[in-house]
Amino acid sequence: MHHGFIRSILIRVFAAAALLATTSLATKAIAQTPEDKTLPTNTRFFIPQPASGSIQQAVGLLEKFQLKNALLIAAMEATPQAVWLTGNTPAQTASTVATTLREANFQRAVPIFVLYNIPGRDCGSYSAGGAENTADYDAWIDAIAGAIGNQKVVILLEPDAIADLPSDCGYDPTQVNIPEAVANRYAQINYAITRLEQQPKTIVYIDAGNSHWQAVPVITQRLITAGVQQAQGFFSNVSNYNLSTYESKFDTWVSACMAFGMNPADGGWRLGNYSYCASQYYSPLGTVNPDDITTWIYTDEWFQQNMGTAVPSTHFVIDTSRNGQGPFNAASYATPPYNQSASVITTLNNGGWCNPPARGLGVPPTVSTGVALLDAYLWVKTPGQSDGTCDSAGGVRAWDYSVYEPAGWPTTAAQQAIFDPLWGLYDPAAGAWFPQQALDLAQRANPPLH
């Protein structure tokens, strides 16, 4: 087959799939008050240009006569997804925003922007980077706000920035003034919320980590300090794999804990005492297991008994881009033919956030969630893009090669240290297209891709 002909056909397939997606998302509108920033039920989310590498992968699949798989990649890329703003100069970023807004206007759709440029981003790990200092960050935020103008957009502000404060990074206190770094982080988030929310149609959500990270009272206090009351709400599960049932319950508790700590009734004993809240890890009413949602009834009961007149009102959104099959569990690698030890399994599970295999795309973006405070399910993480080089050198993989090492796997310690045994290859860098993972996600989508 001629490569150029295949590419032209596939581009038409991508375009047709995108058109079908944008025309099928509209539903009957409902009236919204000007002050209400909750997305209306007829919201149509923006579909960005296909991710770099996706068209090439689909072309390659067609050349191998794998039409079904090529169409799966096309369908994935024709689903609304977030646009990540991860750096560049204020002028360059403003230009990217302006271009995206023009494309979104053409689609009559609402774009989702992820702002990911906080100083000290990702604790210097796989996605390290960010602005040099607060002044540079504030200027970057100003440029984005100015470019947005009066257009409706959704902003997801700085994933991991609140769940992973500088105090969580393990910095050497002789090298980093940790209290100052934490104070700066909160100031940066507060400024960003205030500046972005000045735009009349900008809807801002801030970072709450996920249901298997910070405990409910901890993240609630952090969200309050970060200024969540000035935003529409918070988001969870970005770039993660937790099932939406867990995330929705966790987020509902966080919203409830906020209301609890602001309730002045009964002598004001609740005021500011977010630490009293039960969580996904603890309830005084019974043993709670973060991995067993049936035990979460004890936390539900705690809130039912202690809320008083408080009514949760803080909204949230959930990233469903890769949670169709839930989180990774390495237990099968303890059995033949792998026969990996308990310590290896523990390391693999702890690194389960990093390019886990056999996951799937989750619920496509929608505002029809059935949960009062859950504004939307969104595809925030770009599915198909690598989480990073997930290997033993980075601490997220372990493997006993003396027990299981197929032909073609590396045989030297140096190469094994940068090899991913779960995929049987060397992972692409963070943000690069990972074709094997992309196809795996599409094939295992839940619900299936259309």
PLM regions and their residue ranges:
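C-terminal segment of classical bacterial N-terminal signal peptides
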Residues: 19-29
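Short, glycine/acidic-enriched loop or turn micro-motifs at the edges of active sites
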Residues: 161, 210, 322
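N-terminal carbohydrate-binding/catalytic regions of secreted carbohydrate-active enzymes
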Residues: 39-147, 381-419, 426-429, 433-434, ...
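Bacterial N-terminal signal peptides that target proteins for export
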Residues: 2-14
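Cleaved targeting-peptide boundary
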Residues: 32-40
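Hydrophobic faces of well-ordered beta-strands that scaffold small-molecule active sites
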Residues: 41-47, 82-83, 111-113, 153-157, ...
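Surface-exposed substrate-engagement region within the catalytic domains
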Residues: 33, 60-72, 214-403
